[in-house]
Amino acid sequence: GKWNVNGTSFDKVIFCGNIKDLVKMVDGINVNEYKDSIEKLEYHGTTAVFCEIDKNPYSWIYQPSRKHESHRIICTGNFSKTNNSEDLPDNRMTATIEFTDAISKEDIIENLSRIPLNPKYIDHKYNKYTYPIQDANTRQLIRNLKSSLRVFGLYFTGRFADWEYYNMDVAMGAAMDMVKSEF
């Protein structure tokens, strides 16, 4: 069979999005036996808070604490000078401070007052899907779905496609391994 993606036909398609969306998008293949299990897959979201902080030498700071709800500071200003506005004072840089799940702006600002490096709020965004949560059956479910879709030329890989807590390097490796074994 052929796959029609935005008006173009393909023999094979690799899906790298969220598996919850894939089972809703597929036409012509019966994936009903998987829909309930896929829908029940659990996850955590994060609220990413863009802010300025005191300059420091770190890339990431993991900060488990009972003093605030944040779990990590990503020191984005250290990744590239262009990540920092010219308007920032010399002793300041940009960062993203992460909170598990949704948190209000008021609670963010209140938490920032208790976080090291004197963070100053700029903006925030809640991302619903950040961390996939597995149970004892998740990997087998994904293997079974992959096996049943492979015969139709439909493949998938990625953090939320495979429902695996991949870091980017592992996600890229999984994609390259899939291409080597399937194409």
Segments from the language model and where they lie:
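Mid-domain catalytic core of redox enzymes
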Residues: W3-I115, K120, L141-L145
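Conserved flavin/dinucleotide-binding core of flavoenzymes
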Residues: T82-F183
